[in-house]
Every structure is written in structure tokens, then in C-alpha cells.
């Protein structure tokens, strides 16, 4: 199998940023190709990623979806280029439209025109890396521009987009270098890849020019019931409580009644009912959860989808260190 295997970790799982670097070393030893870390309302993503880059030799380093509202486009460009140099060319920058909750309740910005903003941020970032200036005239940003003191970069990091919907995914194909979707069934992913390819066509690119790395969250354990219970709770919570986008996406993939029931339970803040509303059929479509053999087979099948270049494996919530190690070992020999 020629696909890469990425490891997605959450900053909230660690007591200190150095823990991310320790996980990166573990991932490299097990044969993972890349580690990626998300940023929401906890630590700033840059120090943990820098530590991870410094402690590893060949492991790819990525941030997961970063908000286009929380930093200026020029600062995002500086961050990406700095990380690329810190990682000796192993960095990939991840961005996406974000969500109303993060944008308005954390960054204090209006969640306005997210796709247009994301596009303009990418174009400004490319201006800094390729032309040495953020100068730009757009519908959202007008920047007179100063000179980036380090000049154009010889090897700027690729830009990956985390998107779900058809128009957003078309944008990813057109303006990005990679795509990192989440919570897609196999059939749903195949269908959305058509939107990605359409966007690539608009930019005179092939689908093969993009790194397609779908995110899956799961758990492997000899106690199959425990693994499925924890995965069910996490996936249900994502569908009901993480804003509208994941739920809308899964509903459009054929499960509107399931999403509606989960959301109704969330309205009552009944997390047990949320989990109970996620049937085995849907859990099996969305998450690798079960024995190590079952999880390994699930991820291998997902990796075999035509057009997939990597599978980005993350943990469901509430795992012990032993649980995480078992899950990593279950999938480490797939790539």
C-alpha cells in the first residue's frame, strides 16, 4: 500500500507542550509519516509544533485546520514560513473556514463570508512566500504591503484545506495543495472527491497534484465494546454539538434522521441519548472502532479508496495512554 499514515493529536490531551513532541517521537518510531495538531481555544499551535519538529528527523509536521479569522493573513504567512524552516522543509500548513462558535465567541469576529476569506488568506500567503509581500486588493482584504524581510521562499509549505461542502471542497481543489476532510463515509468521500477534482480542473491541476488525507477518529482495544462505546460517544458529540457543519454533512450523506435525533438530544444536553441515537450502521461508516484487527482492516479499506493519498488517524475522546498506544500500533503497519 502506498498511502501515507498521519497521526492527529489534540493539544488538550497534554499537560505541557513538550508532550506533543514526545508523541511525535513515538509516532516516528512506529512508522507514521506525519503528525498533525489542531488549534481551537487552548494553546497556541506554534510552540508544540516547533518542539515536535525539533525532536524528529523525518516525520512530517502539520497543523490541522487553523482559523482564517484569528490571525492576519501576513501573520499566517510568517507562521507557515517559520514552521517550514524549523521543520527543515517537512511542514504542511492547514487552514479552513472555521466555525461560527470559534470565530465569534473566541476571536470576537463576525463569521462573514468564510469561503471568500479563506481564499483571500491563501492568496495573500502565497504573495508573501512567492513575491515577498502581502500586498493585495480583494473584496475583504486591502493591504498596501511591506517587504517580507526574508524575501521569497524557495520551498514554501503546501497548503491543505479542511472542508466539507461541495463549494468549499471545490475551493480546496482550486486554491489548495491538499484536502483534509472529516466524518465522511466511503461513498460520501468518493462523491466529494468529484468536487475536489472540479476545483483542480479550474486551476489546470490534476487530482493527483493534491494530497488527499481524510481524517478518521477511532479506537482499537481488545475490549471491543469499550472501543465502540467511546467512539460512539465522540462521533455523536461531534455531530450534535460541534456546530452545524459536521451534522449537515453526515445528513447529506444519507443519515438525516440520525443527525436530527442526535441534535434533539443535544438540545437537552443529554449526552447518553446522543450516543444511543447513533446506530451501529452509522458508527461503522464513520469510525474505526473495535479490536485491533478490525481497526486495522477498516483503515486499510479507507486508504484503498481511489484518490486517497493518506489517512489521518486521530483518537476518540477519553483514551488512556495505553489505549492510544494500542490504537497507534494497530494501524502503524498499514502504510
What are these regions (language model features)?
Residues 1-62, 69, 157:
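N-terminal beta1-alpha1-beta2 module of alpha/beta enzyme domains
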Residues 14-27, 79, 162-174, 291-302:
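Short, acidic/polar
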Residues 25-29, 49-60, 80-91, 173-174, ...:
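Acidic (Asp/Glu)-rich catalytic clusters
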Residues 3, 77-81, 85-210, 221, ...:
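Internal, glycine-rich beta/alpha segment that forms the wall or movable "lid"
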Residues 5-11, 35-37, 60-64, 91-95, ...:
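Hydrophobic faces of well-ordered beta-strands that scaffold small-molecule active sites
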Residues 1-5, 14-19, 26-27, 202, ...:
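Haloarchaeal acidic low-complexity proteome signature biased toward cell-envelope/secretome components but also
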Residues 5-18, 65-74, 153-164, 217-221, ...:
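Active-site mouth loops of central-metabolism enzymes
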Amino acid at each position: 500500500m502506498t498511502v501515507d499514515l498521519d497521526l492527529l493529536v489534540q493539544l488538550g490531551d497534554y499537560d505541557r507542550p513538550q508532550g506533543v513532541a514526545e508523541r511525535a517521537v513515538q509516532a516516528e518510531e512506529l512508522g507514521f509519516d506525519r503528525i498533525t495538531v489542531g488549534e481551537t481555544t487552548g494553546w497556541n499551535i506554534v510552540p508544540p509544533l516547533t518542539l515536535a519538529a525539533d525532536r524528529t528527523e523525518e516525520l512530517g509536521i502539520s497543523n490541522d485546520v487553523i482559523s482564517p479569522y484569528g490571525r492576519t493573513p501576513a501573520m499566517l504567512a510568517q507562521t507557515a514560513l517559520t514552521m517550514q524552516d524549523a521543520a527543515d522543509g517537512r511542514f504542511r500548513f492547514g487552514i479552513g473556514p472555521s466555525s461560527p462558535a470559534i470565530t465569534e465567541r473566541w476571536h470576537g469576529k463576525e463569521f462573514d463570508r468564510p469561503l471568500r476569506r479563506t481564499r483571500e488568506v491563501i492568496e495573500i500567503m502565497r504573495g508573501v512566500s512567492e513575491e515577498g509581500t502581502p500586498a493585495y486588493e480583494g473584496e475583504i482584504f486591502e493591504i498596501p504591503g511591506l517587504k517580507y524581510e526574508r524575501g521569497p521562499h524557495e520551498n514554501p509549505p503546501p497548503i491543505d484545506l479542511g472542508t466539507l461542502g461541495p463549494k468549499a471542497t471545490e475551493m480546496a481543489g482550486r486554491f489548495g495543495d491538499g484536502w483534509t476532510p472529516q466524518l465522511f463515509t466511503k461513498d460520501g468521500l468518493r462523491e466529494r472527491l468529484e468536487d475536489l477534482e472540479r476545483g483542480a480542473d479550474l486551476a489546470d491541476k490534476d487530482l493527483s497534484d493534491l494530497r488527499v488525507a481524510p481524517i478518521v477518529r477511532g479506537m482499537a482495544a481488545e475490549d471491543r465494546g469499550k472501543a465502540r462505546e467511546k467512539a460512539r460517544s465522540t462521533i455523536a458529540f461531534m455531530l450534535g454539538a460541534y456546530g452545524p457543519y459536521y451534522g449537515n454533512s453526515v445528513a447529506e450523506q444519507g443519515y438525516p434522521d440520525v443527525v436530527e435525533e442526535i441534535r434533539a438530544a443535544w438540545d437537552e444536553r443529554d449526552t447518553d441519548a446522543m450516543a444511543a441515537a447513533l446506530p451501529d450502521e452509522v458508527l461503522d461508516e464513520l469510525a474505526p472502532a473495535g479490536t485491533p484487527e478490525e481497526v486495522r482492516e477498516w483503515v486499510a479499506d479507507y486508504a484503498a479508496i481511489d484518490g486517497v493519498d493518506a489517512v489521518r488517524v486521530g483518537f476518540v475522546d477519553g483514551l488512556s495512554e495505553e489505549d492510544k498506544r494500542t490504537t497507534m500500533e494497530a494501524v502503524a503497519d498499514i502504510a
